[in-house]
């Protein structure tokens, strides 16, 4: 499966989970389960996408502004997700935050599947897109097991200039 299909599948799954969450009654106990499923889908997706897809585009494309904008949108979505987790646990305006997260992700996905995918298709061969899809799925599974602290460090590393990424990753490797 190519990287575009992998990303689109995840996008659809996360949007569906958010839609289901937003439709819930205020007192539905299933809400916390859905919030956890959204987190478990969104965080690994974002880290793997940044590492595999965004960093590949940054490495070969001289105009990095669209990809850097996408990183910013990931940070905004994760801030909303953490706010949603807090509001869910305290029963405070969680639905309003879920709607904001859904809107932010809908905007991000539209830009990514439009502008970013178009850029990538001009850069990547189909074989490379297939290889990136495999790498994305493997990394996503690994990230899903590592927790928030490790993935927060990965977000910072992914924002480094491409030539420094490996050096930064070596800083966190066990000695």
Residue ranges of model-derived segments:
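Small-residue-biased structural context
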Residues: 1-175
